Amino acid sequence: MTITAAMVKELRQKTGAGMLDCKKALEETNGDIEAAATLLREKGIAKAAKKADRIAAEGLTSVVVKGNEAVLFELNSETDFVAKNKQFTDLIEELGNLFIESNVASVEEALSLKGASGKTVEEVILGATATIGEKISLRRVVRVKKTDAQGFGAYKHMGGRISVLTVLESANEELAKDLAMHITVFNPQFLSRKDVNQSTIEVETKVISEQIANDESLQGKPEKILNGILQGRLNKVLQEIVLLDQGFVKDPSITVANYLKSANNNILSYVRLEVGEGIEKKVDDFAAEVMAQVNK
């Protein structure tokens, strides 16, 4: 397979590795960019690609809480110019108020929901698309419920670039919001170690094993020592991706688990939405993007 400059560029942006390393990795994986990124990690040339590296779609997220129910959702636009537009932010507020007063728990249910005007949300969004001049789309809707004894913590970062909701075993508004802020910053993939799926363990174990095998300073070491190194590195990875194992944002010397224990509380669940998370999108030249807006 022919390895193009565009493929090398994409892999460099994803991993931060050098041009030649990226080209070689692509050649070894027959042009498979994801496989090449993993190969670079195994060789210790690149760190794990983060989800943020792939965030390109624009728009806003929002979280709305009323009593024992909360709704989080994401509304996408094509550019951040539109996401900052008052008409777009007003639409976010309108949808949030409509969703929290209903029972919608999915995009499909939300799109068919009718507002005070008699129009469905889908019709309202199509109208906004026509008026604003960019495609507007509702991507995610999540509904969360709690009991009277439990507590919500909601936090919106940068006006809605990220929205987080936490659910605590016992109501504690300050604690719940602190945890929501922590989750905003550290973006844990799992709540506890028991939630970590086997595929994640297998991938990380393979990457670490290859790193150890390629480390000349570890050549000839006893298998027991190498296994200890592997487990130590795997444990460090888990500490980075598991919420309860992470150092607490306000006091990194203690884990989130210990912080909760000191407050005699537990976190039951959380939801974190970040604009464009996981969406692949062509990134245009900034100047060209500006001119595209001017010429509309």
From Swiss-Prot:
Keywords: Cytoplasm, Elongation factor, Protein biosynthesis. This is Elongation factor Ts. One of its GO terms (cellular component) is cytoplasm. Associates with the EF-Tu.GDP complex and induces the exchange of GDP to GTP. It remains bound to the aminoacyl-tRNA.EF-Tu.GTP complex up to the GTP hydrolysis stage on the ribosome. The keyword Transmembrane helix does not apply. InterPro entries: EF-Ts_dimer_sf, Transl_elong_EFTs/EF1B, Transl_elong_EFTs/EF1B_dimer, Transl_elong_Ts_CS, UBA-like_sf. It is found in: Cytoplasm. Pfam families: EF_TS. HAMAP family: EF_Ts (MF_00050). The gene is tsf. GO terms for molecular function: translation elongation factor activity. Residues 79-82 are annotated as: Involved in Mg(2+) ion dislocation from EF-Tu. Its main location: cytoplasm.
